[in-house]
């Protein structure tokens, strides 16, 4: 939770792309022309503020706005920063009418901007900094909490095998189990049971 208004400002909006996250914008434009349906330039690139483990950019054109998520540059752990996994999940949920941004394309060619990335629609929305929703009427809070519960319930009702996510669940659990190791035996036992269920 970000409580201080000054802290909120640090996490809100966009900024110029920081030097360590810059890339060849001309190559990105060429890729978008070939891979993003309906794309028309010119393109302006901004970077979202805040602490994302994967650098996130706002791609602005006169006609539409997009969001790009990429792996950070540098040496990474093999299973870390899996934006390709993000794209796979979003691509599976979007056709079902689940409230995620429309995904356009995943680029696994690191010659384009240096790392794997994907592009999706930019959706406007508010940020609920405090989960207690201060300043709202009880009826407003009720509506938001109810919508949140329904959205999570809808997600849990997705047939993940039919959605093409089979194998992904098992992989994620295996990675988590490996990460936990012997540090939490009770949690590791629960994950082991879950691994059996995903077979």
Predicted regions: what they are:
Residues 42-198:
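ATP-binding pocket architecture of kinase catalytic cores
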Residues 2-39, 43:
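Juxta-kinase regulatory segment immediately upstream of eukaryotic protein kinase catalytic domains
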């Amino acid at each position: 939770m970000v409580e201080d208004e000054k802290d909120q400002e640090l996490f809100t909006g966009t900024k110029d792309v920081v030097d360590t996250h810059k890339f060849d914008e001309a190559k990105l434009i060429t890729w978008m022309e070939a891979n993003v349906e309906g794309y028309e330039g010119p393109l302006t690139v901004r970077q979202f503020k805040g602490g994302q483990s994967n650098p996130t950019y706002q791609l602005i054109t006169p006609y539409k706005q997009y969001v790009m998520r990429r792996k950070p540059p540098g040496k990474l752990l093999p299973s870390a920063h899996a934006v390709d996994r993000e794209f796979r999940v979003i691509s599976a949920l979007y056709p079902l009418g689940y409230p995620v941004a429309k995904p356009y394309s995943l680029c696994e060619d690191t010659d384009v901007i240096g790392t794997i990335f994907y592009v999706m629609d930019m959706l406007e929305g508010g940020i609920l900094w405090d989960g207690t929703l201060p300043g709202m009427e009880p009826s407003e809070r009720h509506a938001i909490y109810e919508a949140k519960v329904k959205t999570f319930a809808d997600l849990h009702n997705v047939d993940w095998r039919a959605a093409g996510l089979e194998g992904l669940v098992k992989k994620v659990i295996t990675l988590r189990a490996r990460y936990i190791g012997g540090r939490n035996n009770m949690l590791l036992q629960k994950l082991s049971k879950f691994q059996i269920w995903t077979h």
